[in-house]
């Protein structure tokens, strides 16, 4: 299975409590869906976990992971991304994208000038933001991922057309 066959759906933020529970950060549209995709694996695929959600907690979800029974085991997993086979994820509607599909796409402005490539997708609660790693001679750029600012996403061609707001270009 290649990396593109898998999508990162969450990450372990650290231990929660003293009995092996973890604080889980879900990247799913509906955060609790993370537990419904079956076993989740690490990026390398060397470990997999069944997830049982226990309760909402500050900054995420409390969860139990199969084979994690102590606080020390949970602490050791801090920062580990959790991946699922893309085939187990729901189909997306038009103009919906998995963050993993956007990362690496070339970004050009409406005049064709290269702005860079998508380095990361962030969401701090008010909507997705594309982090564009700058082209030669350009600094990085943060763009709101809205239809007005990003009118075209062409996954097949590997490109995005952006219309940065005045002052950001």
UniProtKB/Swiss-Prot annotation:
One of its GO terms (biological process) is rRNA processing. The keyword Oxidoreductase does not apply. Keywords: Chaperone, Cytoplasm, Ribosome biogenesis, rRNA processing. It comes from the Bacteria. One of its GO terms (cellular component) is ribosome. Gene3D superfamilies: PRC-barrel domain (2.30.30.240), RimM (2.40.30.60). Coiled coil: none annotated. It is found in: Cytoplasm. The keyword Translocase does not apply. Residues 94-168 form the PRC barrel domain. It holds the Pfam family RimM. HAMAP family: Ribosome_mat_RimM. Binds ribosomal protein uS19. Belongs to the RimM family. An accessory protein needed during the final step in the assembly of 30S ribosomal subunit, possibly for assembly of the head region. Essential for efficient processing of 16S rRNA. May be needed both before and after RbfA during the maturation of 16S rRNA. It has affinity for free ribosomal 30S subunits but not for 70S ribosomes. This is Ribosome maturation factor RimM. The lineage of its organism: Bacteria, Pseudomonadati, Pseudomonadota, Alphaproteobacteria, Rhodobacterales.
């Amino acid at each position: 299975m290649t990396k593109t066959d898998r999508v990162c759906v969450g990450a372990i933020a650290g231990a929660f409590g003293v009995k092996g529970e973890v604080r889980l950060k879900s990247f799913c549209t509906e955060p609790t869906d993370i537990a419904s995709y079956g076993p989740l694996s690490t990026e390398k695929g060397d470990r997999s976990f069944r997830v049982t959600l226990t309760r909402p907690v500050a900054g995420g979800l409390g969860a139990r992971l199969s084979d994690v029974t102590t606080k020390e085991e949970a602490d050791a997993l801090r920062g580990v991304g959790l991946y699922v086979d893309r085939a187990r994820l729901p189909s997306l509607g038009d103009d919906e994208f998995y963050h993993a599909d956007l990362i690496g796409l070339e970004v050009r402005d409406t005049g064709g000038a290269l702005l860079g490539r998508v380095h990361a997708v962030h969401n701090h609660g008010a909507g997705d933001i594309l982090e564009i790693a700058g082209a030669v001679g350009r600094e990085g750029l943060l763009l709101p991922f809205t239809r007005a600012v990003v009118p075209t996403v062409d996954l097949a061609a590997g490109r995005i057309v952006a219309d940065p707001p005045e002052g950001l270009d």
